[in-house]
UniProtKB/Swiss-Prot annotation:
This is Aspartate carbamoyltransferase catalytic subunit. The lineage of its organism: Bacteria, Pseudomonadati, Pseudomonadota, Gammaproteobacteria, Enterobacterales. Keywords: Pyrimidine biosynthesis, Transferase. It catalyses: carbamoyl phosphate + L-aspartate = N-carbamoyl-L-aspartate + phosphate + H(+). It comes from Escherichia coli (strain 55989 / EAEC). It comes from the Bacteria. L-aspartate binds at residues 85, 168, 230. Its EC number is 2.1.3.2. Pathway: Pyrimidine metabolism; UMP biosynthesis via de novo pathway; (S)-dihydroorotate from bicarbonate: step 2/3. Catalyzes the condensation of carbamoyl phosphate and aspartate to form carbamoyl aspartate and inorganic phosphate, the committed step in the de novo pyrimidine nucleotide biosynthesis pathway.
Length: 311
């Protein structure tokens, strides 16, 4: 039976239903337990990073190689025809799509990945982050990590801390967890970096509980997941960045009242928002979370590029 993600564009987490998410996570678990080094051996995948990235690019490209795919692409658009000669994004994608079986793309402009789908023909586009909008594959690895550590994706208490305005990871993760039952959200951010109203409206429409808080201390005893984010210097003016960057910092001493199995997650890179003394606690799980990116992205690539996937 053909899988529902075959040749599907993955631009927003909302392109995936709850059943789709469960399929990706189940596939990720199978690939983690049983590697498939030749699954994509006849595929060529473009890795097109128009914006700087370390973890996402290396994670995606490692995933491609470990499934046996050939990888082409770039990590600096300044050295492409788009950057040097003024070629349009539409023309760039139109040409690349004639070479490859799938395109993984990061771009600083919101909506760029969706635009790319209009020019990629039958070649699926996977969004690796578009401005402050969406980061669906980060959400997949977040969900995989939450499911591994908590044993479920429903009836969770989840706190999100830091830059909730520009942090595309928290937008995608909130939308994804809203597809499951009984989850409750705690948003902890300075006013200038509050969760966008459209996310709050979505939660209200679904009847999902959420609340705003001014400190981690207010909620630490209640939560199963504490999702930290950095204040994104590249998206703020210098004076605003200086005012808010140190407002929410997690230290080991803040975790004394946490549940025994509460996990601290972070999409990385961190700057000052998680003190290094947290690393030694059993709550710190952000490096394992990053490692899970390999399996979540392998799962998505495998499903998008195989009509009938049997593992």
């Amino acid at each position: 039976m053909a899988n529902p993600l075959y040749q599907k564009h993955i631009i927003s987490i909302n392109d995936l239903s709850r059943d789709d998410l469960n399929l990706v996570l189940a596939t990720a678990a199978k690939l983690k337990a049983n590697p498939q080094p030749e699954l994509l051996k006849h595929k060529v995948i473009a890795s097109c990073f128009f914006e700087a990235s370390t973890r996402t690019r290396l994670s995606f490209e490692t995933s491609m190689h470990r499934l046996g795919a050939s990888v082409v692409g770039f990590s600096d658009s300044a050295n492409t025809s788009l950057g040097k000669k003024g070629e349009t994004l539409a023309d760039t994608i139109s040409v690349i799509s004639t070479y490859v079986d799938a395109i993984v793309m990061r771009h600083p402009q919101e909506g760029a990945a969706r635009l790319a789908t209009e020019f990629s023909g039958n070649v699926p586009v996977l969004n690796a982050g578009d401005g402050s909008n969406q980061h669906p594959t980060q959400t997949l690895l977040d969900l995989f990590t939450i499911q591994e550590t908590q044993g479920r994706l429903d009836n969770l208490h989840v706190a999100m801390v830091g830059d909730l305005k520009y942090g595309r990871t928290v937008h995608s993760l909130t939308q994804a967890l809203a597809k499951f039952d009984g989850n409750r959200f705690y948003f902890i951010a300075p006013d200038a970096l509050a969760m966008p109203q459209y996310i709050l409206d979505m939660l209200d429409e679904k009847g999902i509980a959420w609340s705003l808080h001014s400190s981690i201390e207010e909620v630490i005893a209640e939560v199963d997941i504490l999702y930290m984010t950095r204040v994104q210097k590249e998206r703020l003016d210098p004076s605003e960045y200086a005012n808010v960057k140190a407002q929410f910092v997690l230290r080991a001493s803040d975790l004394h009242n946490a549940k025994a199995n509460m996990k601290v997650l972070h999409p990385l890179p961190r700057v000052d928002e998680i003190a290094t003394d947290v690393d030694k606690t059993p709550h710190a799980w952000y490096f394992q979370q990053a490692g899970n990116g390999i399996f979540a992205r392998q799962a998505l690539l495998a499903l998008v590029l195989n009509r009938d996937l049997v593992l």
